[in-house]
């Protein structure tokens, strides 16, 4: 009998591939995932929305997005493992330590809001909870990308040391060095991570202001932040001479409708020759910005871990709300004459200007009202210290 060795080898190879293929599991919501562990996050997403986020890209969402960065960046290649474990949930495991550090002022709110979920979902680690909660939170913001989420981070065994969180008064050289030491982030990746400032607000940079936005559209994940930081400053939304703050182009405040607050670090990164072109490249480039942010967070979220040890549960991350489709626009009272451009190798896009001779107030709440829905659980974390870079 003649044997077809090519056919036999093909069959054996196919059998090997088939046997090595990961099994699939269908979760209760119909989502197919590579591992049953991913299904634990389906009810967690629902609980986060119903108990904290309420489907809104509001203050609670902003704070959870901030937490994914502050937890993960606390790691150092030069100082070694004793400095911090990166994306390990140490903020939640040691809530009386890291939230009290100077750069983490305000982080206690999101820490206390997440701590109850550790007992409610005991199979989910603190590190996974922090990263997943941030992914769920940003999905409420129109235009945001669907973030990758990998599960399986072990719980932190020690808190990170102080001094690893970049601060808004830091110069560009110090900021870039901190990111390189944390995880070999390039200057362009640092800028990409700052797309989160499109939905960020500050509570403590100016002690007289609550929820001061960084751009005029703080409830949309859009490129407006990259335009407005390039405009010349004309005033402050509250007090002047605050550490880490420089004048902004849209400072008008009326009650709880707080004017735009500009971080010194954003101002500097937008104008430094090492980062200016990356910054400018995102103006009116929604898809490019969202993709770059997703890729940078993908790197941030596994600091301190080996990707191969984790399970890809991205399928259970909610699909974000679609972008509004509104192009980047010069706010009323501003225009091309107000641009302060350092990057000369790339043309600046042609943009329209919103009508009006005076600044339009920036709404305090996503629905335009003065009183926003917000949740704040009691907990062990307390706020001390200095500037909040949200």
Swiss-Prot record:
Enzyme Commission number, as recorded: 1.11.1.13
Name under which the protein is recorded: Manganese peroxidase 2
Organism of provenance: Phlebia radiata
Cofactor comment text: Binds 1 heme b (iron(II)-protoporphyrin IX) group per subunit.
GO biological process per UniProt: cellular response to oxidative stress; hydrogen peroxide catabolic process; lignin catabolic process; response to reactive oxygen species
Pfam families found in the cross-reference section: peroxidase, Peroxidase_ext
Broad enzyme group: oxidoreductase
Function: Catalyzes the oxidation of Mn(2+) to Mn(3+). The latter, acting as a diffusible redox mediator, is capable of oxidizing a variety of lignin compounds.
């Amino acid at each position: 009998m003649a044997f077809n060795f090519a056919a036999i080898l093909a069959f054996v190879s196919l059998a090997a591939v088939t046997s090595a293929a990961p099994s699939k599991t269908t979760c209760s919501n119909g989502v197919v995932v590579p591992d049953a562990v991913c299904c634990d996050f389906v009810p967690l997403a629902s609980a986060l929305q119903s108990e904290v986020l309420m489907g809104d890209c509001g203050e609670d969402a902003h704070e959870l997005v901030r937490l994914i960065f502050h937890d993960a960046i606390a790691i150092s290649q030069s100082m070694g493992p004793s400095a911090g474990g990166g994306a390990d949930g140490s903020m939640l495991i040691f809530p009386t330590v890291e939230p009290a550090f100077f750069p983490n002022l305000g982080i206690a709110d999101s820490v206390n809001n997440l701590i109850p979920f550790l007992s409610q979902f005991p199979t989910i680690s603190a590190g996974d909870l922090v990263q997943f909660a941030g992914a769920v939170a940003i999905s409420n913001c129109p235009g945001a990308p669907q973030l990758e989420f990998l599960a399986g981070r072990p719980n932190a065994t020690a808190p990170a040391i102080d001094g690893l969180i970049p601060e808004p008064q830091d110069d560009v050289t110090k900021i870039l060095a901190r990111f390189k030491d944390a995880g070999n982030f390039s200057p362009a990746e640092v800028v990409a991570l700052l797309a989160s400032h499109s939905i960020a607000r500050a509570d403590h940079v100016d002690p007289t202001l609550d929820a001061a936005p960084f751009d005029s559209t703080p409830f949309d994940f859009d490129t407006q932040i990259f335009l407005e930081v390039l405009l010349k400053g004309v005033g402050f939304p509250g007090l002047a001479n605050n550490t880490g703050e420089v004048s902004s182009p849209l400072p008008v405040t009326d009650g709880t409708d707080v004017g735009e607050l500009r971080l010194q670090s954003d101002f500097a990164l937008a104008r430094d020759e090492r980062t200016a072109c990356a910054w400018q490249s995102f103006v009116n480039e929604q898809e490019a910005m969202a993709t770059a942010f997703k890729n940078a967070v993908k790197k941030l979220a596994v600091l301190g871990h080996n990707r191969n040890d984790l399970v890809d549960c991205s399928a259970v991350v909610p699909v974000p709300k679609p972008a509004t489709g509104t192009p980047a626009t010069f706010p009323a009272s501003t225009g091309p004459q107000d641009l302060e451009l350092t990057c000369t190798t790339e043309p600046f896009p042609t943009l329209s200007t919103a009508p009006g001779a005076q600044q339009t107030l920036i709404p305090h709440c996503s629905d335009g009202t003065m009183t926003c829905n917000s949740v704040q659980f009691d907990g062990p974390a307390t706020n001390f210290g200095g500037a909040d870079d949200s």
